[in-house]
Amino acid sequence: MSAGLETFALKEEDAIKLLACQTHVGAANCDFQMEQYVWKRRADGIHIIHLRKTWEKLLLAARAIAAIDNPGDVCVVSARPYAQRALLKFAAHTGSTPIFGRFTPGCLTNQIQKQFKEPRLLIVSDPRVDHQAVTEASYVGVPVISFCNTDSPLKFIDIAIPCNNKGVQSIGLMWWLLAREVLLIKGKMTRQTGFVLDDKEIMPDLYFYRNPEEQEKEELAEPREVKEPWPGVPPPEVAKIDEVVRSIGMYQTIGGVEPAKKLDFSMVEPVSDWAQETERAVQLDAAQQQEWGASTQNSNW
């Protein structure tokens, strides 16, 4: 289909990427409608996908996506955990609407639902896993583009891109290639510049799934560089602690702690003997009672 145009021909670099990510490795089973995309079958029963046909269907899907005037009318769906990162990157670069995770039934058919959408085109990662979205798209007449393995059913699929849709690197590479071809057809990039957006080169591994546990292990395994402070300048940790200590009224220096200042008790009354104070209070009370009694006897009622 694209053999006459050198611009859209399969390059050696892209073919190496497809082989390195095992995009050509299919499944042991093969659907009768997917036999046209199979090159041959290995001795262990695994079907090998014809990469030239994969590339041709990828270009056809890119042309269909680029034909939509409003990129937001293109809806991308994936329920596979390791395809959601690629899906979000594709949506960010092309402007399409992502639906990742579980697809809520009625999202395309139930108009009173909060998540109701009316897309003009639907793209899924696996027609078997995302069967709910494919079925609802058939009810409302929305065309569907799907990445299909050799054992994937093609019912309600308008454009099937044969590839290994179960591999972590394979599915990420296919989303990356699809986004690149869409932007190329729209004229936002060229073959000479490569996949460059906002002066940043978009590499295929940006679309690959990354396990959070492995990321934490890599961060812990990386050696951290300890920068030596300038002479006479305290390290940032010590300077921060010193600032906090000074803010609460205590004075701490880098070399040690300054001696505590003596408190001035001249304004405080000296503490007296509590026993003497008690006896004095009792005597004053008795004297007052005697005065009250004398005034009562001498008073003339």
UniProtKB/Swiss-Prot annotation:
SUPFAM superfamilies: Ribosomal protein S2. Transmembrane segments: none annotated. Keywords: Cytoplasm, Ribonucleoprotein, Ribosomal protein. It is found in: Cytoplasm. Gene3D superfamilies: Glucose-6-phosphate isomerase like protein, domain 1 (3.40.50.10490). GO terms for cellular component: cytosolic small ribosomal subunit. The keyword Transmembrane does not apply. It comes from the Eukaryota. This is Small ribosomal subunit protein uS2. It comes from Brugia malayi. The lineage of its organism: Eukaryota, Metazoa, Ecdysozoa, Nematoda, Chromadorea.
